[in-house]
Amino acid sequence: MAAATALCDAAAPRMASKKRIALISTGGTIEKTYDELQGVLDNRTSVLDVMLASLQLQGIEIVRIPLMNKDSLQMTPQDHDLIARTAGSMAEAHDGVVIVHGTDRLARSGERVCELLGSPRVPIVLTGAMRPYVMRNTDALQNLTEALLAVQVMPAGVYVAMHNQVLQFPGIVKDKDRGTFVRAGG
C-alpha cells in the first residue's frame, strides 16, 4: 500500500510556480486617455490595470512598476537611461521584464537597454501601440498580450513584440509607412 501511495504521489502533477514578470510603464500612445475638457489625447492616467484585468493571466504574477507617464517624443537621454537601468534591476529579481513604451522612441530605448545591459539574464520585451487603448480600433491589448507571451517563451535578450511579431534588438526601427517595427534595412 505504501508503494502504491508513493507511485501516486510521484505521478501527481506538481504545481508550477508562477513566473514573476515586471511590467514597467513609461506612458506613450498605448496609455493615452481622452481629456474631454482639452479635447486631446494625453498621458495622465495609466490604463494598464484595466487592460490587465481583461486578460486571463494564469501562471504569471505581474509586478507593476509605474516609472513615468510620458509621450515618448518628450523623452530625454536621461529617460532612456532610467528605463534601461530599471529594466536591468528588475531583470535581476524577475523571470522577465515587459516595458510599455511610446512607439516614437521605443527603438531608442531598446537600443539603450542593449547598450547598458549587454546580454540580460532574462527576456526584456518592449511593446506599445499605434492607437490608444481607449480607441475602438486599438492595437494596444493585442500588443500587450503578445509581449506578455513573448516574455515567457523567448530566450534571454531584448525584443519588441507588436503586430504578431517578435524582433530582437539591436537593429530595430519604426517603419512609419507600415505602422510597425522592422529590422533596419528590412
Task: Describe these PLM feature segments.
Residues 1-5:
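Compositionally biased low-complexity segments, especially N-terminal hydrophobic helices
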Residues 7-10, 14-186:
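Active-site histidine-anchored catalytic micro-motif
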